[in-house]
Amino acid sequence: MKIFSCALAARERLAALALNLGRQTLEGVAPSLRPALLLDRFGRAEAFVGQWARAPRSVGALCPSGVHLARRMAAMLPPGDGLVVELGAGTGAVTRALQACVAPERLLVLERLPAFCRVLRSRFPELTIIRGDATRLADYLPPNRPVAAVVSSLPLLSLPGPVQQAVVGQMRAATAHGGCIIQFTYALWGRSPLVRAGCRREKRGLVLRNLPPAKVECFRSF
């Protein structure tokens, strides 16, 4: 009952947010297109809240990642033409930022929840969207295709220990030949599970213009 009440309250806040920020988010958009754009954005946020209410540990956050967080993650992508794999894409906030930096054929998006997969396929019909589990990442990677980066929005700290270890192991294996792992977390202090698993942190940055504020880190698995 408590989770349900939180979800309803969040839904009301999202509606208020859409109205209060309408002038800013719709600036430059043709008036005839504004209702559809608002409906699309609110629909994606509502889908996110609904999934959080049903499975809070697997979603990890009440709201989708903000645009500033998504852009910071995309800015950490390494140069080159290798495959970029996104884990836990949700409703596509980070996917959109990655798409602005990476050709569609280089981007592989993995999402476990069916509702989010439907949203992703609707928003990004040109991308490869796979419904799958990050603990089996190796099963979805094309053969003989080097992975330049794994970009993860998975809530590593809230995953059960064995699942967390399996996911981290899959990310390390996928990037073992020179790739990097880009991970964000709402835990602004403390060591990442990736560091505990032996990864070396190369970069990090705080994104204060996100709700809640987040930390983005880039790791190498060797």
Regions found by a protein language model. Name each.
Residues 120-121:
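Conserved SAM-binding loop
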Residues 91-103:
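Conserved SAM-binding loop of SAM-dependent methyltransferases across substrates and taxa
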